[in-house]
Amino acid sequence: PGHSLMPATADNPEGYWEDAPLVGLDDALLRTLGLRWDSLPPPPSGWRTLPIVRRFAADAARVVAEEWGPARFAVVKDPRLCRLLPLWVDAFTAAGFDASCVLMARRPQEVAASLARRDQFAPEKSLALWCAHLVEAERDSRGLPRTFVAYDRLLAEPAATLDRLCRDASFPLQPDAEQ
């Protein structure tokens, strides 16, 4: 992650491990597109070519430079990336990074229960959001080195999962089973 992580909250005391400037930019772009993080419709067709999005592309490049600067690699976590991935792939590529994607999948019932607790969402909305995020991330990450990781597998077998993740997504890490 970058330098400016979102703080922990009462409903997530361990923290989100999400970069606040990136999340803020994603939320602002979604608002500009008439969406929110929990909107069911995808961004409009051709959203990347809209003139206003060019400003966000420049802001994304600035965020990458400020948060990751000369780092050899960057790890970014923000569920909004599922909807806005092309913008960030372009920003990281322009900064000299080779983009790879990890598509982390939690069981849909776990996601629905979590969103019901935190946001009082109906199970149907939560499941539809889960599906939309996963489908858009899969579509927009085609052509990039990527891997799919089951969240429960990561928790059960962290060393083996990280080893496979690094190999499949071409990450320059050699995970240490002791860490």
Where are these regions (language model features)?
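PAPS-dependent sulfotransferase catalytic domain
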Residues: 38, 42-45, 53-175
